């Protein structure tokens, strides 16, 4: 007969979560709170994890960007990161990094999804809606679609 399992300590739970993927401080606090006796216990553990560099909001933000930047625009990624209470410094750095690569990322997403200029206004609207829903700005989407139209007008094959 199997022995009953001992409940995991708060530290073991935290390390288990962090061993699977990066977490923000707020996300880890939310996951650990039901298992702690007090809020102070959770905060002390989170402070210790940050001191040991096992928990880092900056690393978490980089992880989210690395996982999702190839599919989503700056607006959508920033909205997701804001829900994790990262702080203005980390968000500012990430936003600057994302805006610098927004055009290239949007072009790659557009080419993967559509690959050719819109044939009519309905298709153009569909492409714009798709790209804006992915978090790309209307200005960037317009430039990409206009660039594709220009290629078609020149008689070249779209890239």
UniProtKB/Swiss-Prot annotation:
Q: Name one GO biological process term.
A: regulation of DNA repair
InterPro entries referenced in this protein's UniProt entry, alphabetically: RecX_HTH_1st, RecX_HTH_3rd, Regulatory_RecX, WH-like_DNA-bd_sf
Location, primary (coarse class): cytoplasm
Q: Which compartments is it annotated to reside in? A: Cytoplasm
Which Pfam families does the entry link to?
A: RecX_HTH1, RecX_HTH3
Q: Which residues cross the membrane?
A: none
N-terminal signal peptide: none
Instruction: List cellular component terms (GO).
Output: cytoplasm
Q: Which UniProt keywords apply?
A: Cytoplasm
The role this protein plays is:
Modulates RecA activity.
Homology family: Belongs to the RecX family.
Protein name (database record) = Regulatory protein RecX
Organism name? Ralstonia nicotianae (strain ATCC BAA-1114 / GMI1000) (Ralstonia solanacearum)
């Amino acid at each position: 007969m199997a022995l009953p399992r001992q409940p995991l300590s708060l530290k073991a739970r935290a390390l288990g979560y962090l061993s699977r993927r990066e977490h923000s401080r707020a996300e880890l606090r939310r996951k650990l709170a039901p298992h702690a006796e007090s809020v102070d216990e959770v905060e002390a553990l989170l402070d210790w994890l940050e001191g040991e560099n096992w928990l880092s909001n900056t690393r978490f933000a980089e992880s989210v960007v690395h996982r999702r930047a190839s599919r989503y625009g700056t607006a959508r990624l920033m909205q997701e990161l804001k829900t994790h209470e990262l702080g203005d410094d980390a968000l500012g750095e990430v936003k600057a990094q994302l805006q610098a690569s927004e055009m290239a990322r949007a072009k790659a997403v557009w080419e993967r999804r559509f690959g050719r200029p819109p044939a009519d206004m309905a298709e153009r609207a569909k492409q714009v809606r798709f790209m804006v829903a992915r978090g790309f700005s209307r200005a960037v989407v317009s430039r990409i679609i206009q660039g594709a139209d220009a290629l078609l007008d020149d008689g070249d094959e779209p890239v």
